[in-house]
Amino acid sequence: MQTSHYAAEKDMQDAAPRLTFTLRDEERLMMKIGVFVPIGNNGWLISTHAPQYMPTFELNKAIVQKAEHYHFDFALSMIKLRGFGGKTEFWDHNLESFTLMAGLAAVTSRIQIYATAATLTLPPAIVARMAATIDSISGGRFGVNLVTGWQKPEYEQMGIWPGDDYFSRRYDYLTEYVQVLRDLWGTGKSDFKGDFFTMNDCRVSPQPSVPMKVICAGQSDAGMAFSAQYADFNFCFGKGVNTPTAFAPTAARMKQAAEQTGRDVGSYVLFMVIADETDDAARTKWEHYKAGADEEALSWLTEQSQKDTRSGTDTNVRQMADPTSASAFNH
C-alpha cells in the first residue's frame, strides 16, 4: 500500500478512534500491507492542487510510527536523484534512502524497513556493509530494494551514466551485483570475478543477523527473470480507479517466472490511496487533484520513459508513466 501525501497522515490521525482494521493470522500469512514513504517532495501526487511540502525526517518518522501502530508490515523508501520539474518541482527535492531508513529503524521496533539502492551509484560491498549496519540498528528488520536505474539524467549529472547500451545489459549488471551481495552477506567474503565487478578477498563483517530480504521492481521479461532468481518480492503497479485486481496479469507473470526457478517470490502491489470520510468525498478529492495535474512534470516522465528502446514495452518506468498507474493520473 502506498500513501499519497502527508494529508493521508492527518487523515489517519483524525480517523484513529474509528479504525478497527485487523487481519486474521491466516490472512496475514497471505498478505502484507506496507507504506511507501514520501522521501520526495509532494509524495506521490503530481498535482498543483495536492498539498505541497518538502520531505523531512520528522514527516517520515510520524508516518512510519503511525503505520507501525496500526500493525502495517513494512515501510519502504525509494531513491530519486533528479526529479521531474514542472510547476510543482516534482521530486526535485529528496532525502537519501539508506540514511533515512537507518534513522527510522532506530525509532521503530516491529515494522520491516526497506531502503533502495541505486546500484549504479553504490558499489555492492558498500551496500552490503550499510545493510548489515541497519540490520544491527533494527534488530534484523532491514531489507534492500535494488534498482538498476532508468532515468538517464540522474546519472549523467554525476558523470556516471555508462552509455545507452546499459539499457539492454542492466540486469546482467544487477545479476553480478546481487551475487556479490550474497557472498558478503552469506560468508563475509567475496572473490567474485565478472564483467562488471572484480572482488579480491573483499570482506564484510559483521554479517546480517538474519537472511537479507531483497526486493526488485522488474516488469520486463528480463526483470521478471531476475526477480524469479534472486528476489524475495517483486513490485508491480496498481492501475485504474477502484480496480484493485487490475495488477493480476502482472502478478501471474511473476508467479510463472518463479515456478521456473522453484522459488517463492511474492508480489508487492503499489496502490495510491485517496481517503476521506465517504466514497463520494474521496472521489471529489481525487477529481480535484486530477484537475490540477502537473502536465509539465508528467510530460517529462513520459519522455524519459521512452528513452529505453531496448528492454521491451513492459519496463518499470513505462508502467510508471502509464496514465492509469498508481503514481500518475487517469486522463
Curated annotation (Swiss-Prot):
Regions of biased composition (Polar residues) lie at 312-331
Q: What induces it?
A: Up-regulated by the nitrogen regulatory protein C (NtrC also called GlnG) and repressed by RutR.
Under the heading CDD domains, the entry gives: Alkanesulfonate_monoxygenase
Q: Which positions bind FMN? A: 79-80, 145, 154, 170-171, 220
Q: Which HAMAP family match?
A: RutA
Q: What does this protein do?
A: The FMN-N(5)-oxide reacts spontaneously with NADH to produce FMN. Requires the flavin reductase RutF to regenerate FMN in vivo.
Q: What is this protein called?
A: Pyrimidine monooxygenase RutA
Q: Which organism is it from?
A: Escherichia coli O7:K1 (strain IAI39 / ExPEC)
Gene of this entry: rutA
